Amino acid sequence: MALLTDLHNHSCLSPCGSLDLSPRCLAELAAARGVKVLALTDHNSSLNCPAFAKVCFRLGVIPLFGMEATTAEEIHCLCLFTSLEAGRAFGEYAYSILIPFPNDPEKTGDQVYVDEEDNIEGEVAYFLPNALDLSIEAIGERAAGYGGIVIPAHVDRPAFSMTSQLGVVTAGPWAAVECVRLPPRVFHVPGAADGPAGAGHPDTGYLLDTLGYPLTTSSDAHYPEHVARRPFELDIPAEELQPGGPGTEADMGALKRALGRRPAFRQPDDG
């Protein structure tokens, strides 16, 4: 049985997100739109994950916890955990190596964390989307040390992606690679404008070599209307992913196996 899954979503904690998109709002909208496996991935913080967990368990949604981390190269990566405590611990670590630049809510947006009823519990002082003192080479190892996985985010976007910062998708301990659209095409590297169908056509662009990693899509929700706009299917029964039954945390081994069954793509060797 396939489970509709969405692994990249923000909440009111991210300054670029809507204050209306609380963890409760995210979980309720996703559940109403058929999502069964849902991750909360605010910028460099997991402070809204406890509230998110409570609402997901109440709704029967399988939650994953973590963040969209910004590496030293300004590459966005999803760091995901099946354990709430592991996600919270990694969040504390990430904040300790975040560039300590104060947030100005009037200029860059609010950064509030809330309880499961949307009551504000506090506000984060430093601007969360800033880079961590952690390279793309190191992030997979660090997340694994907390029991998590890493998925490079929106690799086909022209900003804050592997291709925008490095030009290519690089090898690493990635559980999957996230794309905005499948198959992944980029328009911001040399040769991207040379597609056969002409500028602006969906088939124009450079077909991106994602090195055979499993591919996912995601909503990257920042506003309520974004929720569940680009989910994907995980080929796994709910009882295998969540062996403890409803209201319990997912099994990381099962999640990795399910991601490994996702479609993959690699450019043929011209040689």
Question: Can you say where each PLM-predicted feature lies in the sequence?
Answer:
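Active-site gating loops and adjacent loop-to-helix segments of metal-dependent hydrolytic enzymes
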Residues: T82-V124
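Alpha-helix-centered segments that form part of catalytic cores
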Residues: Q111-G145
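Charged catalytic cores and adjacent phosphate/nucleic-acid-binding surfaces used
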Residues: M1-L7, L13-V35, S46-E92, L128, ...
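Short low-complexity stretches enriched in small and charged residues
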Residues: A30-A39, F101-D110, L128-I136, F160
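Ser/Thr-glycine-rich phosphate-binding loops at phosphate-binding pockets of nucleotides
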Residues: S11, A39-T41
